[in-house]
Amino acid sequence: MEKKIGPVKTGKRHELPWEKFEIILILNLYFQLPFGKLNHTTQEVRKLALLIQRTDSSVALILTNYAACDPYILQSGRTGMQNGKNVCKPYWDEFANNKEQLFIEAEKIKANLLHSTLEIQLGITGENLMGLTQETVIKQRVNQNVFRNMILNNYDFRCAITGINVPELLIASHIIPWAENEENRLNPENGICLSPLYDKLSNIGVQLYR
């Protein structure tokens, strides 16, 4: 099980102006978290803060700036943090309708910060690509990882049916299968968190939910 990360209250870069790569990484995280987890206690926020050497509170603040740019959040009657919104708005406008490009770009940035490569981080180095191009496999892996993060966070890392909360035993299952509807592959409303047994039952057509 993944080790929990404690509060990141100081960072080597906490007094420096925000850079483009940081704002992109935070937007990438924004699209993978529900509104209720845009705070400094969320493990993914702490992990990113540690990676970019910022405080967890400062990363959480940028996340709420992005919420102030999000029409879905605003239409629901909720508001993000308006102060600082202008820093995030250009990146929102660039990537909100091109999330796949954002997710790939963010993973490249992470790999670079870890002194690694995207291929190594995704575990596809030297792999038999089964006739697919490396670019296609990278895109699939990144999108699948993002979808998993979205769904597990939305369900608070619990199987929707059994309540089991062991991440290694949870699957981000598509309601409409991945191969059948490209438009909804990354739509969190098309996902449900299941244990392996119920995921397999779903895949063979057993109706688990209405």
What are these regions (language model features)?
Residues P7-L29, I138:
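Short, Lys/Arg-enriched anionic-surface-contact patches
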Residues N28-H40:
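Short helix->loop/beta-hairpin flanking segments within DNA-binding domains
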Residues E44-A49:
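Short alpha-helical "recognition helix" segments of helix-turn-helix
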Residues R54-D70:
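Major-groove recognition helix of helix-turn-helix-like DNA-binding domains
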Residues T55, R158, I171, L194:
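The −1 position to Zn-ligating cysteines in a subset of zinc-ribbon hairpins
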Residues D56, C193-Y209:
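Short Cys/His-centered divalent metal-binding micro-motifs
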Residues P71-D93:
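Short Lys/Arg-enriched helix C-cap and helix-to-coil transition segments
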Residues I120-I164, I176-E189:
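Short, charged surface segments at domain edges that flank catalytic/cofactor-binding sites
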